[in-house]
Amino acid sequence: MLSLYEKIKIRLIILFLLAALSFIGLFFIINYQLVSERAVKRADSRFELIQKNVGYFFKDIERSALTLKDSLYLLKNTEEIQRAVILKMEMMPFLDSVGLVLDDNKYYLFSRRANDKIVVYHQEQVNGPLVDESGRVIFADFNPSKRPWSMASDDSNNSWNPAYNCFDRPGKKCISFTLHINGKDHDLLAVDKIHVDLNWRYLNEYLDHISANDEVLFLKQGHEIIAKNQLAREKLIIYNSEGNYNIIDSVDTEYIEKTSAVPNNALFEIYFYYPGGNLLNASDKLFYLPFAFIIIVLLVVYLMTTRVFRRQFSEMTDLV
């Protein structure tokens, strides 16, 4: 038969376990809500920063087009114009290509290749063949005014253009910013129109740079995703019937979704997915300190109580 001390000890163990389990359950219920709320707040904060950074990127492209225009002031000779554009492109790795419509309506295209070499295509007659530097025909009967970067933009306003098929890069999409030469600039430049195309690799790397390793970030134009960060490139992204995207991975991560247009550029949309609250997230470790402290206190109280009872029963046994 169990002694009175052992019976009391068993009851103390049961009470301790019940208290510990009740506390653990209550802690996880409360902390789960806190973690979820903190995740939403962090997602809002991160998305606000992402929006600003993406907006800065597109503004930089626009400023680059203006800088390119400034470098062409008073240049009338086509060789001087070519040298000026190539020099600027070497300083602007985020540009894939630059196109110029000269004041005589002839077209020049400066295209960056995989080895970072910039090749030049040009027209020797208006709407005629586009040829390379050796005179080889690249595109017959090329009409710049029929290209998407020209048709989608107004004759007076500078604008971004929807993604279109690059004629010099089969299977790839181009996104262009078109700069129109108007007013007094028209008298100082031998150019009527400039378009600059984004470098896709550079844009993807930029999204990598501004996002964290556990965040999914991509840009959309129309129904097409035009750029992704590293995690977005690794995951399966499925467009659903509700007009949103499902992020599929092997661990079924829950994400907080945030979307908006690029600041001051409604043509492009930002899709941002922040990982939902995780009770085991290292960023929440401070909330586990009170939990660990109370468990330790309960354990100490239990050990002290059993020790006191053991001593009392020992003294009673000695008296008997």
Segment roles from a protein language model:
Residues 17, 21, 218, 269-320:
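Cytoplasm-proximal transmembrane signaling helix
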Residues 123-195:
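Extracytoplasmic/periplasmic ligand-binding sensor regions of membrane-associated signaling proteins
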